[in-house]
Curated annotation (Swiss-Prot):
One of the primary rRNA binding proteins, it binds directly to 16S rRNA where it helps nucleate assembly of the platform of the 30S subunit by binding and bridging several RNA helices of the 16S rRNA. Forms an intersubunit bridge (bridge B4) with the 23S rRNA of the 50S subunit in the ribosome. This is Small ribosomal subunit protein uS15. PANTHER family: RIBOSOMAL PROTEIN S15, BACTERIAL AND ORGANELLAR, SMALL RIBOSOMAL SUBUNIT PROTEIN US15M. The lineage of its organism: Bacteria, Bacillati, Actinomycetota, Actinomycetes, Micromonosporales. Belongs to the universal ribosomal protein uS15 family. Keywords: Ribonucleoprotein, Ribosomal protein, RNA-binding, rRNA-binding. GO terms for biological process: translation. GO terms for molecular function: rRNA binding; structural constituent of ribosome. InterPro entries: Ribosomal_uS15, Ribosomal_uS15_bac-type, uS15_NS1_RNA-bd_sf. It comes from Salinispora tropica (strain ATCC BAA-916 / DSM 44818 / JCM 13857 / NBRC 105044 / CNB-440). GO terms for cellular component: cytosolic small ribosomal subunit. It holds the Pfam family Ribosomal_S15. Part of the 30S ribosomal subunit. Forms a bridge to the 50S subunit in the 70S ribosome, contacting the 23S rRNA.
């Protein structure tokens, strides 16, 4: 389930470190978190959609790897990011 451009732009504006920032780990994790939330809602209705479930697991793994990267690079940025996103890592 892809996000539309307006939703991505809103997320980028909120989590960007500098103007025009699209590739920082914070922005990538925020976009992945939104996609994971949308896919989770989809799977609550469509319980037997196993292809989407696999896609969800791939997204969760990608987000986990990015969060591990941020944690290794700067623990304060990591803590602030999970606080802002409401993740329970």
């Amino acid at each position: 389930m892809a996000l539309d451009q307006q939703a991505k732009a809103k997320i980028r504006a909120e989590y960007a470190t500098v103007e025009g920032d699209t590739g920082s780990p914070e922005v990538q994790v925020a976009v992945l978190t939104k996609r994971i939330a949308d896919l989770t809602e989809h799977l609550k209705v469509h319980k037997h959609d196993h292809h989407s479930r696999r896609g969800l697991l791939l997204l969760v793994g990608r987000r986990r790897r990015l969060l591990n990267y941020v944690q290794k690079k700067d623990i304060n940025r990591y803590r602030s990011l999970i606080e802002r996103l409401g993740l329970r890592r």
